[in-house]
Amino acid sequence: RVLLIEQGNLGGCGGFTRSMYEALQLEGVTNHVLMDDDAVIDARVLRNLVSLLSFTGDSKVIGGHMLDLLRPHFLYEAGAVVKSNTRLKSLHHNIDLRAVDALIPFNKYQEVDYNAWWFCAIPTEQIRKAQLPAPIFIRGDDMEYGIRLKELGVKTVAMPGIAVWQTRKEPAEHLNMVQDVFFSSPKDVLEL
């Protein structure tokens, strides 16, 4: 069963948190998918996700890749890893998927530290453990939540075959440019 929660673009704390809260109130909800309202998705991606979730259950966060809507054969990002506890590094940024050699890194399982919420499936059991996102809206609020999940031992994997198309955004490592003026790490947001 799928329940679609539609709402305006209220940011992570206003929109995604509301839907997470609602999912936690419902009986029998096993996974919660977060997806940007301006993302374009092929329905087969949902089928792939459901198949994958039947194997992973409530143990892993499944992140979707972001493909460039203006250049549909370009992978814009496939998750990110934390570098030096203050920066994120995008994985597989700006890759032309028409080149066969570009596909080689996707032949192996690769965990990431974080996957943006343009498309991200989080087991409701893990949401219960991590609790709801911080009640603030700042660019990168999904990043803080992903790091929080990682610190709880929840693994995140960005899976080939699960992706959305979206107009390009800054890769994860650029999210810190403005925030660096105020915060030394994404977790400092919580110490305001």
Predicted regions, residues:
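Donor nucleotide-sugar recognition loop
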Residues: 115-119, 124, 128-147, 153-162
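Conserved donor nucleotide-binding strand/loop of the catalytic core
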Residues: 2-14, 22
